[in-house]
């Protein structure tokens, strides 16, 4: 018989098969036709991934059935799942994992049955049989987990023609789900639907319960005219606003919509797109702003000002600017006056090179300040390397040179093997595989060369997600230094880090050697969750003690708090939760101990085991 195999690119392959063919045979036929190795193929039918050893007839695949071919991407990745309580779970997945697999992993971690889980990404509810790569979910993406509440309800949707549609929904349904149900009933594509409740337009990624829509509520359906689209507006605080617009809307209209949402008067708004400030009378389509484009909103500080730009030839240019202008805007104004392309301009103020995306007010540039304009020469440049002895070496380099290349040049000049060199710039240790331009090292920058003492060593830091980070340290490094290195690698602020070794929390001012941490030791990194919580500890006498703790506290810390309150030495305490004895080096969050949980304290008898 014939069956069809559809790829993600939309191509359909026709195969001659027998009902008794195994999935392995089918993959071999696909390899013959398309050259795709079987171990990179995943076949899906009726939402299920097919197993190699089963046959077509096992899956009731009949003539002219269509299978879906998904390529298994090499390599695992981490993703995050955020619950409505704000808790974030980290999962190890592959792009080829199905949503069903992901729900099973969540069940393993959190105990929530898959049939009560609904996963949302980019405002869409994810279907069990599809894969992460189908939804373009990449490493470090965040999914949202919504629990499916038992028991549905009816709501009504009223159209502009006066017709009322009845829908069966759940409070946890997203607006997108509701639009899909309307499409099923009425045939109106979701992208032409706008739903209004209590005077508010409802956003696709939100749920009915977010809007407090209850049973027998009535929504109003307005059809979105062709050409309607969503755009995003990002403020300097990092907040992103979503707007419904048409390509023919003027910038003035857009500012009015922002005023409706955020209360900012239009005359205080400046909108930037592709580095350009947008003019009120022009339209979105004039600027080629398309659906899902992001504009940047800068607040116009009252009153413009003049600044001066001095070139290396001694010429001074006067510019009219606002504190909220970006450096990119300033370079555009210089281009207008002097004809110098922005990519050849480097602006310096107070000895610092200014970055395009920052504003004048970010750098505290005030009226009548003077900037210095340096032309960016094509090609090579000189940099300096300063050693701890105070000697300065001059090197000829290119921005595209790697740190490894630079170390080789230092070896040529000074004879120091690269593996004994550590280069520091702007307080950061530079990694071999990165380039000078990655670190924004420009001509006449100064790097600092530190020799890697033979006491240098590697240690490992293990996070609660199971990820292990490798750090280059010295025994004399303080815990504060180690936290700074973790921040460089992982972006976690030191004040949110707690490091544990041998069951003890490490103090910032102490050194690794104080704690006898040697090469290849493993530290445990616990995130200090914002805000503590209370838990209760019940003794066998029936007395209940209340403790102030953090989810990241170790059991050892908790025992120390009990000792402070009750005078019982930690080595005589045994703590029980959910029938399990708790181990000293683990944290409260490891055991899913949440606020107002009750632990049981049992005294360890002398001589006992």
Curated annotation (Swiss-Prot):
It comes from Gorilla gorilla gorilla. The keyword Magnesium does not apply. The gene is UBC. The record marks 68 as: Essential for function. This is Polyubiquitin-C. Belongs to the ubiquitin family. Keywords: ADP-ribosylation, Cytoplasm, Isopeptide bond, Membrane, Mitochondrion, Mitochondrion outer membrane, Nucleus, Phosphoprotein, Repeat, Ubl conjugation. PANTHER family: UBIQUITIN. The lineage of its organism: Eukaryota, Metazoa, Chordata, Craniata, Vertebrata. There is a cross-link at residue 76 (Glycyl lysine isopeptide (Gly-Lys) (interchain with K-? in acceptor proteins)).
